[in-house]
Amino acid sequence: MKINRIAVALVTAGVMLTTSLAANATHRWSTYHWARTTSSFTLKTLNSTVANSNANWPQLLGLAASDWSQSTKLDLSVSSYTNTSTSRKQCSAVVGKIRVCNAAYGSNGWLGLASINLDSNGHISQGTAKMNDSYSSTWTTDPNEARHVMCQEIGHTFGLDHQSTDGSSQSSCMDYSSSPNSTRPNTHDYDELVTIYSHTDSYGTAALTSAPATPAAFSAMMGSVPLGVLVHKDHFYETYVAADGKGGLWINQVYLAPGFEHIKL
């Protein structure tokens, strides 16, 4: 699939997704999914988090991995990965895996950032989930929000979008509610994963072990570097697209920090 075709499809999907969320309560993120040759699969998850005084990120990653692994379609296998300050700020993606990082990425307007890399066929080939400690006061004010953001950013790397975008509670971490019930997946999230992964593909991206190096421009991304072209914005999030230099695309979804929400659209 050519990049321009993917970009056009993404913009179209963004419009369709907004309608779909309201009308059908489906919340798959366009058609994004990992390619697999089996009905269910294991997704290796690299832990590049460290605990701080505001949030115990390694513990929250463990909780999120356990919750998401209740799905009949995927199982998260978490392993430790380099977690120096520099490495976490770069949070370079690793092919065939998702990487989870926390760092002080700066007062750039985002609380969490989920990024997926689509290969030339439009399948997810790697992903990252970042939590921004520059807004650590958010975690202090509402400890549940740290678990909420961790769970949601990881969910995006599977191809899930939001259950609601108006701040109402769906008792799911895939909403934007501050409810203490919105810290983990619910039945609808698991059902949506069954729908997304109801078919198999001719190859697997979660099994890949090598690929061209992640572009330096993306590896150095700390929030101040442009995320690409803004293709969609809502009250609580924004979506950006950037070419990856090898025939695919990076799709970046930004969870806006308090005070940066779009009140008027």
Q: What does each model-found stretch correspond to?
A:
Residues V11, R36-T38, A93, I124, ...:
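Short, solvent-exposed coil/turn segments
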Residues A13, A64, Y197-T200:
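Alpha-helix boundary/capping residues
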Residues K2-N54, M222-L265:
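Disordered inhibitory propeptide/activation segment of secreted metzincin zinc metalloprotease zymogens
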Residues A55, T200-H235:
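Ser/Thr/Gly/Pro-rich low-complexity, disordered linker/stalk segments of secreted
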Residues W57-D166:
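Metzincin-family zinc-dependent endopeptidase catalytic domain
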Residues T45-W57, S134-E145, Y176-T183:
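Second-shell loop/turn segments in exported
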Residues T140-G204:
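The catalytic-center signature of Zn2+-dependent metalloproteases
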